[in-house]
Curated annotation (Swiss-Prot):
It comes from Psychromonas ingrahamii (strain DSM 17664 / CCUG 51855 / 37). Coiled coil: none annotated. HAMAP family: Ribosomal_uL22_B. SUPFAM superfamilies: Ribosomal protein L22. InterPro entries: Ribosomal_uL22, Ribosomal_uL22_bac/chlpt-type, Ribosomal_uL22_bac/org-type, Ribosomal_uL22_CS, Ribosomal_uL22_sf. The keyword Transferase does not apply. Keywords: Ribonucleoprotein, Ribosomal protein, RNA-binding, rRNA-binding. The gene is rplV. This is Large ribosomal subunit protein uL22. CDD domains: Ribosomal_L22. GO terms for cellular component: cytosolic large ribosomal subunit. Part of the 50S ribosomal subunit. The keyword Ribosomal protein applies. Belongs to the universal ribosomal protein uL22 family. Signal peptide: none annotated.
Length: 111
């Protein structure tokens, strides 16, 4: 039994979100939620919401027991990048890259 949840166009770079995703991959969900709640990173809040959604999907759609769930797959892919211009001195301009990512979490039973 598997349940999936996605957050598309999350406003964090994929590189920063992968640091957090690598910490919770393969963990039981209760341990992962505890780790995410104490992490100071912005991506931890985004990933925690997706994990909560995946747990709710497993409970509602599959009737799964929450205590048995494990994060079997978590992947962070790059989303589109918004390019913005920042005016600088002497008529120059810098490009500001506002990156986004797609977070996918799959939870399933241990057995």
């Amino acid at each position: 039994m598997e349940a999936l949840a996605k957050h598309l166009y999350a406003r964090s770079s994929a590189q920063k979100a992968r640091l957090v995703a690598d910490q919770v991959r393969g963990l039981p969900v209760e341990k992962a939620l505890e780790l995410l709640s104490y992490s100071p990173k912005k991506a931890a809040v985004l990933i925690k919401k997706v994990v909560d959604s995946a747990i709710a999907n497993a409970e509602h759609n599959e009737g799964a027991d929450i205590d048995e769930l494990v994060i079997t797959k978590i992947c962070v892919d790059e989303g589109p990048t918004m390019k913005r211009i920042m005016p600088r001195a002497k008529g120059r301009a810098d490009r500001i890259m506002k990156r986004s990512c797609h977070i996918t979490v799959v939870v399933s039973d241990r057995g």
